[in-house]
Structures are given as C-alpha cells and as structure tokens.
C-alpha cells in the first residue's frame, strides 16, 4: 500500500519534480559533507580572513591527547616501574619508530640518528592519532584535507633537503645525475630527476589525503544506504539491509587498519627520503 501511494505521488508531480526531489535529498546527505571545514571563531585582520575552524579544533585536541598520554605514562607524570596498558602502548610506539629509524637510515652513528628521531616520532604519533580520531562518529578527519597533508609533507621535505645540503654540501646535487650517464643525456636526466624529486613531497601528501578521504566516503555511502533500507519498514528491505550492514562493519575494521597503515607508510617514506638525502642513494 505504501508503495502504491509513493508511485501515485511521483506520477502526479512529474519526472522533473522527482529528479529535483532526489537531488535535494542526496545533496543534503552528501558523503563529502563530513569533510566540510566550518568556522567556529571568525577573525578578520584587515582584508585577511582568519578563523578557528573545526579542523583546528581537532588538531589541537589530537596534540593535547598525545601530550597528556605521554605525560601520564612518564615517571614524572605518574608512570609506574611495572608498565600499565597505556604505558605499554607508548613504549610500543616508541620502540617501533626507533627500530624504523635504525633500520631505514644508514651511514650515521646512533647519536646522530637520535637527532632525527624526535621529529619522526612526533610525526608518526600525530598522524596515527589524527587518523584514529577521525573514526570516531561526529568527529573530523584532519588528514582528509589536501592542504593539511600537503603542508605537512612539503615542510618535512624542505627539512630533508636542508639536511642533505648540510651533510653533503653542493655534492648533494649529484643526487640528480646518476653516474655513467652520457653527457648529451645529462640535461634531460637532471630535469627528470629534479621533477621526480619534487614530486616526492606531492605524492607523500596526496597518498595520505586520498586514502583517508576515499575510505571515509565509502563508509558514509554504505552506511546511508544501510540506514535507508532499515527505515523502509519492510521485511524484504530489512533482510536486504543485513548485507550492507556487514559490509559497513567490515569496511570500518578495514579503515582502522588503513588509519594505522597510512601513518606507517608516511613515516617510513620520510625515513627513506632522509636516507637518500644523507647517503645520496
């Protein structure tokens, strides 16, 4: 009976009105709506517009959470000689990143590697917690925005380039010209290597942004589809809803893995690029 009234209603208003109806319905529940940056505290300085947004809020919350967690598990902040669960988690992250730095960066003594370790540890921890808090309902995924990931990747990439010049001087430019290249091909290879080197920073930011945005969008689409079928008040639709519901649960678990994996991939690529800049590989 409900389907009959729906069919009669749509036949009376016409196909054009139906298309507008569904367009308005879908636009109000767009899967990209979760990535909207909303100003919380608007600020104007002359012709420049600044504002404290939801993205800024969740970045501050992530940093605060990391600082509180580290302070809590240290001895000064109340850590125990016998580690509890939180202390074990921080030690696990610390040892994981330390082993990553020791394995991927060669040609340096342990003391010199320790100079790079804090930056790499903070980067991994920040990205890990940003990705994980984006899985919480009604939160905001900071790493799903291209400008944020691109700003992070370019700032780290500039720092790696500076380290390369500090360690090797102008000999660092030999990284752009492989040994044994014929002289006529040298200008073309230098240009190609320079473009490839600069695109490292771009690909580093795009990879993180694209994976986080695509995964969250897919979960949102399937969640909306499952919820729509669940609200149909029909046994057929309810049974058909179980399939999308299980897929949503599986994708949520997959997204948790992707959140951890992307923080790892971002960090290991930083170590590889830093090793290339130091050892000119």
From Swiss-Prot:
Subcellular location: Mitochondrion inner membrane
Intrachain S-S bonds: none
Gene Ontology cellular component annotations, sorted alphabetically: mitochondrial inner membrane; proton-transporting ATP synthase complex
Single GO molecular function: proton-transporting ATP synthase activity, rotational mechanism
TM region positions: 50-70, 116-136, 145-165, 172-192, 219-239, 246-266
Major location (coarse): mitochondrion
Membrane topology label: Multi-pass membrane protein
UniProt-listed Pfam families: ATP-synt_A
Record keywords, A-Z: ATP synthesis, CF(0), Hydrogen ion transport, Ion transport, Membrane, Mitochondrion, Mitochondrion inner membrane, Transmembrane, Transmembrane helix, Transport
InterPro entries noted in UniProt: ATP_synth_F0_asu (IPR000568), ATP_synth_F0_asu_AS (IPR023011), ATP_synth_F0_asu_bact/mt (IPR045083), F0_ATP_A_sf (IPR035908)
Quaternary structure and partners: F-type ATPases have 2 components, CF(1) - the catalytic core - and CF(0) - the membrane proton channel. CF(1) has five subunits: alpha(3), beta(3), gamma(1), delta(1), epsilon(1). CF(0) has three main subunits: a, b and c.
Role of this protein: Mitochondrial membrane ATP synthase (F(1)F(0) ATP synthase or Complex V) produces ATP from ADP in the presence of a proton gradient across the membrane which is generated by electron transport complexes of the respiratory chain. F-type ATPases consist of two structural domains, F(1) - containing the extramembraneous catalytic core and F(0) - containing the membrane proton channel, linked together by a central stalk and a peripheral stalk. During catalysis, ATP synthesis in the catalytic domain of F(1) is coupled via a rotary mechanism of the central stalk subunits to proton translocation.
Family affiliation: Belongs to the ATPase A chain family.
Protein name in UniProt: ATP synthase subunit a
Gene of this entry: ATP6
